[in-house]
Amino acid sequence: GIEWHPSREVYELDPARGVALLRDGGEMPYDLFLAVPVHRAPRVVLESGLTMDGWIAVDSLTFETPYAGVYAIGDVAAVGTPRAGVFAEGHATVAAEHIAARIRGTTSSAQYGGHGICYLEFGDDEVGMVDVTFFGDKRSGELIGPSTELAADKAQFGSSRAMRWFGRDWSAIPA
């Protein structure tokens, strides 16, 4: 079965024994270990002089730093949204519009709204979706599904980004 161990810190894995060593001296056996590591900015960013409390301070609507013409997006930016690709994509779109306007000698009214979605696998070809908006007058969060229709949406979401980012069709690998 799956076990949840809140407030217990894993500090090392012993793959030969299939055991996670816990900071409190305990051990947790595992067959497959899935974890999210601590989020932190890369050393080069930390040493750049741009960070405050480990992250780069930005205007949360435009991603401009306190240094005119310098923008920070994604995992290094102190924005107030989860550090996930869907949010970084939104950061990039807004920052790119502001950078392009600066190059053209104009201004941009583009603002980040803190919107993102996350697909959740439920098994049996069913997928759910969390749809959240963190900023603005209409802050919201909703769990939609699960359904087989959302499985198709998830596949389209992934393939459209692969085409846009990498210029190639991203088809599911047959099981």
Residue ranges, per PLM feature:
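Glycine-rich beta-alpha junction loops
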Residues: V10, L32-R40, G116, D124-E126
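Hydrophobic residues embedded in beta-strands of well-ordered beta-sheets
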Residues: G18-A20, V127
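Active-site-proximal substrate-binding core of FAD-dependent oxidoreductases
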Residues: A100-I144
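C-terminal auxiliary extensions adjacent to catalytic cores
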Residues: M129-A175
